[in-house]
Amino acid sequence: MAKLAVNVDHVATLRQARGAAYPEPAAAALAAEAAGADAIVVHLREDRRHINERDVRVIKEVIRTRLILEMAATPKMLGIALSLKPHTVTLVPEKREEITTEGGLDLINHHSSIKQTVEALKNAGIMVSIFIDPDLDQIKMAHRIDADMIEIHTGAFCDAVNEHQRQREFTRIVDAAKIGTRLKLSVNAGHGICYNTIKAFQGLDEIDEFSIGHSIVARAVLTGMDRAVRDMLALIRAL
């Protein structure tokens, strides 16, 4: 059965909306963990627009599950990751003007520098995932640079505006998951997945873990984190 990694970035977004000291992302992480989350995800962006280094350190200290740190593949962020030592680092592209991560890493054109980051993280005992579009050549490159896993970018599928586009994008995800599995990569999926779109993944056993944040935090505002996480877990268990 696929696992659930809960991203608590948008708890920090709510905090930053008022420049307040609350809500505390670590408290949300503990609540998600208590509800059954298999891992906690945070994206430490270079502009620190939501999660900051203190958040990451506190979350790592208090949770018992895995901490997954999303970050750009830059020397400065590498140094921070080596200091924080999360269980896993997911390397993601980053643009300051974007609202959220807009696409996967381009390994074809940047494999040399990203490979150096992968090697440094793995030498420190940190698992490495690559956030990647469902493109077969990109996935093959992730294998060549010795990543442990990939996270398939599901945004194009989740944001599809018609059935034709939805089917086309989901076929790309299926093909990507299967080639990743054949290459002995662990295969995760994330970005834009909500309580409706998760249902499409029924029968796609190649997905090891779903990384979901915004939809869970949005529901948690109305129902509480415990209920929001348990509702998503129930849908994943039914896949």
UniProtKB/Swiss-Prot annotation:
Subcellular location: Cytoplasm
Keywords assigned by UniProt, alphabetized: Cytoplasm, Pyridoxine biosynthesis, Transferase
Residues annotated for 3-amino-2-oxopropyl phosphate binding in this entry: N7, R18, G192, G213, H214
GO CC entries: cytosol
Enzyme active site: H43 (proton acceptor), E70 (proton acceptor), H191 (proton donor)
Keyword Cytoplasm: yes
One example GO MF annotation: pyridoxine 5'-phosphate synthase activity
Site feature (Transition state stabilizer) residues: E151
List of residues binding 1-deoxy-D-xylulose 5-phosphate: D9, H10, R45, H50, T100
GO terms, biological process: pyridoxine biosynthetic process
Pathway terms, separated by semicolons: Cofactor biosynthesis; pyridoxine 5'-phosphate biosynthesis; pyridoxine 5'-phosphate from D-erythrose 4-phosphate: step 5/5
InterPro entries: Aldolase_TIM (IPR013785), PyrdxlP_synth_PdxJ (IPR004569), Pyridoxine-5'_phos_synth (IPR036130)
Catalysed reactions, semicolon-separated: 3-amino-2-oxopropyl phosphate + 1-deoxy-D-xylulose 5-phosphate = pyridoxine 5'-phosphate + phosphate + 2 H2O + H(+)
Enzyme nomenclature, EC number: 2.6.99.2
Subunit structure, as described in the record: Homooctamer; tetramer of dimers.
Family recorded in the similarity comment: Belongs to the PNP synthase family.
Protein name: Pyridoxine 5'-phosphate synthase
Taxonomic path: Bacteria, Pseudomonadati, Thermodesulfobacteriota, Desulfobacteria, Desulfobacterales
Gene that this polypeptide is encoded by: pdxJ
